[in-house]
Amino acid sequence: MYDIKAWQHVFKLDPAKEISDNDLDALCMSDTDAIMIGGTDNVTEDNVIHLMSRVRRYPLPLVLEISNIESIIPGFDFYFVPTVLNSQDTTYHNGMMHKALKQFGFMVNFDEVVLEGYLVLNPDSKVAKLTQSNTNIDIEDVEAYAQMVNEMYKLPLMYLEYSGQYGDVEKVEAASRLLTNTQLFYGGGITSIEQAREMAQYADTIVVGNIIYDDIKKAIKTVKIKKESNK
């Protein structure tokens, strides 16, 4: 079993987007710690299977971040399940999870399931609109959510999701100060090694996504934070 705690860098691939074999090879051979597959819309069983089969050729941990029940398939090392803490719709707190367990709970290997305390922070993102997330939150709110995740829910991961927008470093730092046991993931808008380096000061794990499809060379450069890290 892979040790998620050791991950510093993850590439996130959207199954609804095209990526060439050459670019995929470059990502998977880049020394990233893991590949995550996930997206907000147009995520289907077919495109998840297709992308998974291409990534499986490489000796890397492979994660499915679940966005709908229909696209859950066997064959991943881990299944990350977001519970969106600032969603105003209980579907995205535990409603989808409840529905999935009613159907498939008897066959779930819970050693592969990782619950993420998720904060959606980009008001213009598709995921914010889909989940009806209250993104108008300040540092004190982030600190309260971090305490909730770390001290009360005792979740293994907290994920600050800016979804295409580069985030507020002070909020990431605030969360990191209070997460003594929970691992902090940051994702959103990282387009350069400088931004990756800045967020990696506070997040245990950075997730790099959109830049893969805009500039593969810049995406690959973000992996350098692993060699620079003193963690």
Curated annotation (Swiss-Prot):
Provide the GO biological process annotations. Answer: glycerophospholipid biosynthetic process
Top-level class of the enzyme under EC nomenclature: transferase
Q: Which UniProt keywords apply?
A: Lipid biosynthesis, Lipid metabolism, Magnesium, Metal-binding, Phospholipid biosynthesis, Phospholipid metabolism, Transferase
Identify the EC number(s): 2.5.1.n9
Q: Cite the InterPro entries for this sequence.
A: GGGP/HepGP_synthase_I, GGGP/HepGP_synthase_sf, GGGP_HepGP_synthase
Q: Does the keyword Lyase apply?
A: no
Q: Which cofactor does it need?
A: Mg(2+)
CDD domains in the record, alphabetically? PcrB_like
Q: In which pathway does it act?
A: Membrane lipid metabolism; glycerophospholipid metabolism
Which reaction is this enzyme known to catalyze? Answer: sn-glycerol 1-phosphate + all-trans-heptaprenyl diphosphate = 3-heptaprenyl-sn-glycero-1-phosphate + diphosphate
What are this entry's molecular-function GO terms?
heptaprenylglyceryl phosphate synthase activity; magnesium ion binding
- Annotated positions binding sn-glycerol 1-phosphate: 12, 159-164, 189, 209-210
Q: Which domain of life is it from?
A: Bacteria
Q: What intrachain disulfides are recorded? A: none
Q: Where does Mg(2+) bind?
A: 14, 40
The family line of this record is: Belongs to the GGGP/HepGP synthase family. Group I subfamily.
What subunit structure does UniProt give? Homodimer.
Among HAMAP family, the record links this protein to: GGGP_HepGP_synthase
Q: What does this protein do?
A: Prenyltransferase that catalyzes in vivo the transfer of the heptaprenyl moiety of heptaprenyl pyrophosphate (HepPP; 35 carbon atoms) to the C3 hydroxyl of sn-glycerol-1-phosphate (G1P), producing heptaprenylglyceryl phosphate (HepGP). This reaction is an ether-bond-formation step in the biosynthesis of archaea-type G1P-based membrane lipids found in Bacillales.
What's this protein's name?
A: Heptaprenylglyceryl phosphate synthase
Q: What is the lineage of its organism?
A: Bacteria, Bacillati, Bacillota, Bacilli, Bacillales
